[in-house]
Amino acid sequence: MSDPKCRILCVDDHFDTSEMLQVLLSESDYAVQTAGTMEEACALAAKSTFDLYVLDKRLPDGTGMELCERLTFLTPGIPCIFYTGDAYEVHRRQAFAAGATAYVAKPDIETLIETVHRLLAERECAAEV
């Protein structure tokens, strides 16, 4: 297996979800880091470069909407995917208003992985050899 090319930050306060995302996305040759809080995610984003964010809507120290707004301000142009159990249309609209690129309802992991592949295929990291 080659070195991972694209870097993903997954933010979810449920350890099992974070672990599952790390395993499944790593199998697709992505470098994956996880965070369980907004504070942890912002600290990682400030010191590392990511090509994509996967965010949960509910976090212990704020909302995914707040985090998405912060991340899009700190790192403009980096896509944010919401992967959340809150599948209501109002939440989807709020996520897009906060800067989300995509919104996938849990537990639809296949759609999430397809969305990650599609968004990262458009990024420079996917073209690196």
Predicted segment positions?
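Short amphipathic alpha-helix used as the core "switch/output" element in two-component signaling
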Residues: 65-76
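Two-component/phosphorelay signaling modules centered on CheY-like receiver
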Residues: 15-33
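Alpha4 helix (beta4-alpha4-beta5 surface) of REC/receiver domains from two-component response regulators
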Residues: 66, 87-105, 110-114
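Acidic catalytic/metal-coordinating carboxylates
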Residues: 37, 63-66
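Active-site beta3 strand of CheY-like receiver
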Residues: 48-54, 59
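Non-catalytic signal-transmission and effector/linker regions of two-component phosphorelay proteins
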Residues: 1-7, 110-129
